[in-house]
Amino acid sequence: MLLLFKNGKLLVKIKWSSKEDEQEVSRKLGKPEALCEARWEALSMSLSRSECTMECVSTSSSSSSSSNTFSKTEDPLRFMSERKNCWLSVSVSSRSLLPGPAAFTPLAKGEAEKSIIELECCIMRLIRWKDVRLCKRQERFKIRLESGNIFWALEYRSQISLFKFKSGSRFGTLFVLIVMFTTVHRVQCIYISIYIYAHAMNRTGEGRKSKGKKTCMLIPGPGVAHTYIYVAGPGTASVRLIVLLLLLLCIVVAVNTSGSCTGTNTMLRCFTSFCYVSACGRTQ
């Protein structure tokens, strides 16, 4: 499996080391489109065997004095900043991911052409998000990586907050990861909130149709904010109402924020005063 990043933009490229690997995955899953989800255990195993590599493949004829191979101990931010004109490839041995159950999850036909790939959150460990303690072996969930987002966020992030909610057996576990940056305009804050609300409602609708399907998606806001929302189970009318109330509260907070809504203090007031929207549903 090969993921390509060009100047911070994710381009999905799937390659199998052999035709036998592809046939084996198809045999286990029953669908030839099964491409690209890797469990945390599989990634961990692959890393420990040094079968995961990151490499910068230069697109220019000029040679660089710095090494093009990404070391596991190297800071990815510096690695990216020093190599602007290159492809950054992340390679995972497909054979090393095969033994574990559910090592791959089928994607809809044509999904790869849209430059969208679904991986578990622990893929972030591969690129050393050392301050994100989001990955646990017992709590597996997916993060949707859309074109251009993952390394963009890596390169410019300044603060990460993790919110985890549990509400007994009636509701599933809700994860919200908000990546906050140094300047956020009030209009962007409102726009991001509306954007989150629309996508959250869409996701809960999908969950309701699929009987407790769990998914986690990356929602790109305009300019300087990204939010990860974990939606568990089918949506309910009460959940939609709660999300709408949170949205309205966020807009009120953003509109009433004094000044030009720039700077760290204003950003924190804007985002930490419930200026995030979450969606949660009943588990089956």
Swiss-Prot record:
A GO cellular component annotation in the UniProt record: membrane
Subcellular location: Membrane
Transmembrane is among the record's keywords: yes
Keyword Transferase appears in the UniProt entry: no
Keywords from the UniProt entry: Membrane, Transmembrane, Transmembrane helix
Residues spanning the membrane: 174-194, 217-237, 241-261
Membrane protein topology class: Multi-pass membrane protein
Additional comment: Partially overlaps GAT1.
Name this polypeptide is given: Putative uncharacterized membrane protein YFL021C-A
Organism: Saccharomyces cerevisiae (strain ATCC 204508 / S288c) (Baker's yeast)
